[in-house]
């Protein structure tokens, strides 16, 4: 019995307008709409040929392959030549061909995950009549029918988080990160994050969840709070937002506040600084969302790691081949900063793909330029896997799309981009992040292969129930409501 979408109207690869709440949702293009329509048509045809219901077909590897092949067809018809999903033409019908290209045993370490505590203190700051997140797709899950005016928040529970991330996807480890906020307005606090980590750990002690410590050094009390975060919460990095601050004014990492944060982290023995760059919140303090400061601090602090979350990607910028000195926005601000400060590829700057890859899945030309430039200038050892889930629902569709995406031969020849090899995919999926986060893949595999999450997944896959739903806002009204709730 299918608990979710019994009629099979939801595609397993989710190309839609959902945002992570840090930027206003951007509608998908007419081409994306056509591709989604074609994918549903082909799902209907292929499910009939295989004598399956459309829902049963769509939750299979063939369903994902059929969807990606439909995207290829629509993109090719529109003249998109930069990249494609490298799948056998029969993968939409042949489960072995689909499995060969969309299933895998890579070590997958998602360095950017999010969780909202449905019972957190933040609810007490809202009017009793408020129904935060009620309009999100995910709020329509089965748990929403339980008693209580806010029962739908159970759809955001730790159990649902575990299902989306560890049962419905191939993710092995995730880092819980934080949204920009003050301590008083955090939708998930350090205590919430630790409690969620403990829920997973209690399943059998495996280290499947790690956490960041949120700090904005231009905010009163945040610098001093770093000591307590490092001492008491076993954090793996400090996470900061340079476009965020009092009165909407941000900071640069090489400003006094930024340097104070880096030096304090250094003294505390926390070598990872995770910084949101790109995906600007709006026009105010826009320059602080760009990456000009990254190369400066990377050169000044060679013993520190700077993990650039979103890689400086700007959704409204069409990525193209890098041109030194052209002053282009987006990922090029990161590349230019590295070049200006003689920071070599595969040094102490890392480019993370959360939200960026999800958006790049819309346009294979954009994806080819973005990935090609990151591999070339940041280094194939320093590109990190992140998905920004739960906002985009289960990250499995992002995993499947990345497993199969390839830069075209034309773009390789014209722009010097590399072919994406299986070895490079393994690096991006987890091996690259294992270094700054101090994780041994072998150790993690040893624990996660036999822990209770793995056992639950084995049982779950006998009757999988992926929802193919998202959590984040999908339009301006939902986005503004999200901001009002402290998102």
Explain the meaning of each model-derived region:
Residues 106, 124-203:
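Alpha-helical scaffold segments that flank or form the walls of functional sites
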Residues 89-92, 173, 178-289:
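Active-site gating/metal-coordination segments in enzymes
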Residues 1-52:
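N-terminal secretory signal peptides
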Residues 116-119, 181-184, 218-221, 245-247, ...:
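Active-site environment of divalent metal-dependent phosphoester hydrolases
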